Amino acid sequence: TQGVKEITLLGQNVNAYFYEQKDETIDFVTLLEYISEVPGVERIKYTTSHPKEFSDRLIASYRTMDKLVDHVHLPVQSGSDKILESMKRGYTRIQYLKIIKDLKAARSSVSISSDFIVGFPGETEADFEETISLVDEVNFDGSFSFMYSPRPGTPAAALPDHVPLNVKKDRLARLQAKLSKNALHYNQLMVGNEYEVFVEGLSKKDSSKLSGRTSNNKVVNF
């Protein structure tokens, strides 16, 4: 491994990985197990995972595989079952929350980040409030959020009841304020504790300092 201490598996729906050969079947967890046995590797990351493919076996690996970092990025997109179905996400709000609950039970220190889209066609204020309530319930540690914008030729572009731009902007601002507040609270809980930091290079803000990340994906400059 030539001194490599951290490996990141990158892919869209990366946890859906599956490889089959004559005498062996390798799923995502098996791949993680193989990597964890590589001498010198101390941290394993992956992104981006999909809730539909987040198996009980993958959740259980957070009990046994110490090299998996304390962070999972698990895009939910919406807290409304109606919108999730319209998006064809393949899971419900309850199913998503169960994954989070089981992950926290497997490893209480794991932090969760996510992706959100507001203003998807047909999203009502009630649907949006379900997203807000999901954010309150999970307490995400940082997330990415966007306004829906139609792309010609996609199924969503042909859906009725497109949300006005001013409404989308308002909902995005409200969601981001909530997400930022939760992320700040999470950061404040870390104050006064010690964390191992893997150095990634020089600080972008001050080249006289180093920059790295904690196991729960916090950037640290020192």
What does each model-identified segment do?
Residues 18-36, 40-41, 87, 150-181:
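Radical SAM enzyme [4Fe-4S]-AdoMet core and its adjacent flexible, acidic
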Residues 144-149:
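Glycine-rich phosphate-binding active-site loops on the catalytic face of alpha/beta enzymes
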Residues 132:
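P-loop NTP-binding/switch modules centered on Walker-like glycine-rich loops
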Residues 123, 135-140:
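Contiguous mid-protein beta-loop-alpha structural module that forms a pocket-lining wall or clamp
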Residues 74, 115, 135, 143, ...:
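Hydrophobic, well-ordered secondary-structure elements that form the walls
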Residues 158-222:
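Terminal RNA-binding accessory module
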Residues 4-125:
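Conserved SAM/AdoMet-binding glycine-rich loop
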